């Protein structure tokens, strides 16, 4: 079973409170999501493997550590996931970026796929799938289905806010996936929104309604 972890670092929690506030404007919301994502990238990459290499400093030859193992790809779930990409690239600037596009049908609350563009070597990469919200879990489950169908196997999912219903649904459907969130909220309301949540992350990131 993959792990589930709430990243309760004080800076993450402080910045998350700022974006939860309904009067937080687009500029600040976008900046805070970027900063939270950078902090989350630091936390979720703790188990990336290292190997020894020989280098020469200005003083002497030395054995030091460098990243080993699979290369990295960041995969945002469009469109709101785009807001988390730059934060991850701040920490892992050489990562490739794929895209998975889907929208939520407002009547059924189920996701509908409309776009997939991934690195050609996706099966050989450690994937960090990012989406600010894990509500019903439908979009995340469909994204995992799409990625696994294309050969991906080493996947971590990151969100800012999750509902218990979404966490359960995702872990039931994909028990091998590690799931990280900055907050586990109370429940979903009748419209499928996380309570207390932070509203529609996509609209708040891009200034739309």
From Swiss-Prot:
Its source organism is Lactiplantibacillus plantarum (strain ATCC BAA-793 / NCIMB 8826 / WCFS1)
The yes or no answer to whether the keyword Magnesium is present is yes
Q: Where does uracil bind?
A: 194, 199-201
Q: Kindly list the biological process annotations in GO that this record carries.
A: UMP salvage; uracil salvage
Q: What is its EC number?
A: 2.4.2.9
Q: Name one GO molecular function term.
A: uracil phosphoribosyltransferase activity
> Short name of one Pfam family for this protein?
UPRTase
Q: What is this protein called?
A: Uracil phosphoribosyltransferase
- What CDD domains does its record include? PRTases_typeI
The note on cofactor binding and number reads: Binds 1 Mg(2+) ion per subunit. The magnesium is bound as Mg-PRPP.
This molecule's function is given as: Catalyzes the conversion of uracil and 5-phospho-alpha-D-ribose 1-diphosphate (PRPP) to UMP and diphosphate.
> What positions does the entry give for 5-phospho-alpha-D-ribose 1-diphosphate binding?
79, 104, 131-139, 200
The record's comment on protein family reads: Belongs to the UPRTase family.
InterPro entries recorded: PRibTrfase_dom, PRTase-like, Upp_B, UPRTase/APRTase, Ura_phspho_trans
UniProt note on regulation of activity? Allosterically activated by GTP.
Q: Which residues form a coiled coil?
A: none
Annotated catalysed reactions: UMP + diphosphate = 5-phospho-alpha-D-ribose 1-diphosphate + uracil
- Which cofactor does the UniProt annotation name? Mg(2+)
Ordered alphabetically, the record's keywords are:
Allosteric enzyme, Glycosyltransferase, GTP-binding, Magnesium, Nucleotide-binding, Transferase
Highest taxon above the source species: Bacteria
Q: State which pathway it belongs to.
A: Pyrimidine metabolism; UMP biosynthesis via salvage pathway; UMP from uracil: step 1/1
> PANTHER family annotated for this entry?
ADENINE PHOSPHORIBOSYLTRANSFERASE, URACIL PHOSPHORIBOSYLTRANSFERASE, CHLOROPLASTIC
